[in-house]
């Protein structure tokens, strides 16, 4: 045994946790130790004064756990009181200690806090009992220390009293009132309290004697030496274990020996003046103790409500002992005299409440960090070994439980899938109902069906972009941009419905040819039937008419569009592919028509000159192609078609087709005849008798008529030219829609062979690795060009390492960035090198967001990294020590700055992940967070970085 100076271990390393106690026969439980307060009752003999007054004994003791009133006053019987132990007047103090306090006192040697205090009315024997308990505890503690040779113990002694709510240090009587402070590690502590290191057993007994001599004592009518203050003796025990005998460094615990002052009545003690003031303070503090015990007993020791610890300094100091980290024993002392029956009952009520209070005692270990880590590793290894080799008797039971759990999980997954299917079905039905109501209000039945519109589901912004791209590069990039949207609804599309939509688009294409045919018929009649214009213009019109007829023959398809439920998609695809040459021929023919119209426009000046050279008599009979009063209706007869995706335009076109009849041409002709007859009447009636002046007037009128006709013809030809141009665009758009549907059909067939393709892809890991590296390099470069958030780059780079399942995410990310780069290039903002300081629009906002993000990361350098880590990073990234703030900014500005340097990319990802805590959370980040979303953007507030850039996808 060695008793010396205390070990200077910081209190921050005190670990209060259950642990196996080396060198002890008893092992603490594997969880927090919860136990009731040990409550015992000790009844003293009658005092000489009580015997002289012939006072009677009012209590009986049926056994060692029960006390019952004799009811000598013939009051209402209260019944027996049961406790852990009940000691009658014949029991000695040593027996009280052995059965009611010894186990609690010795637990302090094993690192568990312990408290023993006496409670009772004045002159009931509290101080007498606590003196014997203290002496026996000191003897037992030193006896156990002598037997425990593998540990070194250090004891510290301190004592205080609470006199009139004033805390006084009993080891330093010259000290004034001491303050109580709250310490986050120790709890409530007494400021400037003296703590003596105990040298040996005799030294400890000397200190105890000194403390008792310094305590406040006074005389009352009931007791010559009545304690006028609450005394608390605290013994701190730190037991250090040798390095080779255990896993923990040392145990640290406190033993509190509390001698409370007794409750008293002024009528019995005959107190006045100072004694009366002392008694009032004593009663007030004991009342607070009673309230705390009652509150704790009602909640089972758990602090579910407010516990009034701060109402008294006594309860504040003993807060941990009354319901916290401590083992507690309460010895309630009683006077057996009948004259003190009321106070004895109050004491028994207090004891009854106290035995319901639960404390949570724990082992307080002072552990070195390395030893604690080693101990925890051993504990983990032990638990893993137990898991690997479980109890054979429990294995079948566990196996059956696992099977049952798996069965339940599988059943729940099936139910979830069924619910999802029902949800999707309900949503589709709701969408169908909504679209059907819109169609009833005026939509065209020849337009795309509800299901196909839902499958394509393009936003108006997407259609504008697609319209612009169709005019330059129709089939390639737009198709790639739409395939992602088509895949989302491929599985839910009926094959027969797809074939039906293809046929309807072809019928629309055929109707466009009919419109062109009708327009050229009007123009042909204008030039051929009425012999207006030169011979070249007439031949040009005839050529146009023959080419349109040929176009109709090429694009002719059967009128049957009713498809059976089980239509062959493969046959339809083969038929469409065979028509690809016809589509190309159709476009070539339209180009020829365009050139012919241009030639016709070039003929107009020559026609005008030839008309001027002719004489007026030869032009007596002229029929204008259109009534001049109806010139404003020409755009209604020859109308430029609208977009095929517009329901309103479809209604206009189909209305013209349905309402157009053969008499329409006759109406035009009759209008022209009536107009010409009105003009030619004077010329025809008096041809021979005309004077030269009248002939000259007629010649002027004919020139005016020719000029008016020329203007009308020019307007008609320009209308046809614009119409043919628009017709080309509509044919292209129809062809594009057919390609979309064909892609959707091919996607259906591709899904059937998805499993085979997966097997093939698994068989070639080397090729996939090369593709992965190439795609990732492209994505990194596009990140740099599009000013993508650094956090998004880091998360994407660290999540996708080349697993075959990452292919879809890389493809989606690459397409999204490609689209964004093309969109910015279309605005003239392809890269920051071209922007300089004059960035505008979305590029400028993205650059601003990226700058704000770098400033945010620079602030986190000091908070997330210690000085050593920061210095290592500065050296690694070659940052000169010009200043702390500048170095942080230089470090952050170098992150993700070189997309061609993969080492820079890897190091940047590691630094950003450490700064944002991406690598510290330990949680699984879902890869689905990077999937491409085609729905409309929400109104939620976006964060800096990728969210701002991702909003560009919905332009």
From Swiss-Prot:
Residues 36-357 form the Kinesin motor domain. Induction: During the M phase of the cell cycle (at protein level). ATP binds at residues 120-127. Its main location: cytoplasm. It comes from the Eukaryota. One of its GO terms (cellular component) is phragmoplast. It is found in: Cytoplasm; Nucleus; Cytoplasm, Cytoskeleton, Phragmoplast. Residues 366-443, 566-604 form a coiled coil. Probable plus end-directed motor protein that may function in the NACK-PQR (NPK1-NQK1/MEK1-NRK1) MAP kinase signaling pathway, which is essential for somatic cell cytokinesis, especially for the cell-plate formation and its expansion. May regulate the activity and the localization of NPK1, probably by association through the non-catalytic region of the kinase. This is Kinesin-like protein NACK2. It comes from Nicotiana tabacum (Common tobacco). The lineage of its organism: Eukaryota, Viridiplantae, Streptophyta, Embryophyta, Tracheophyta. The gene is NACK2.
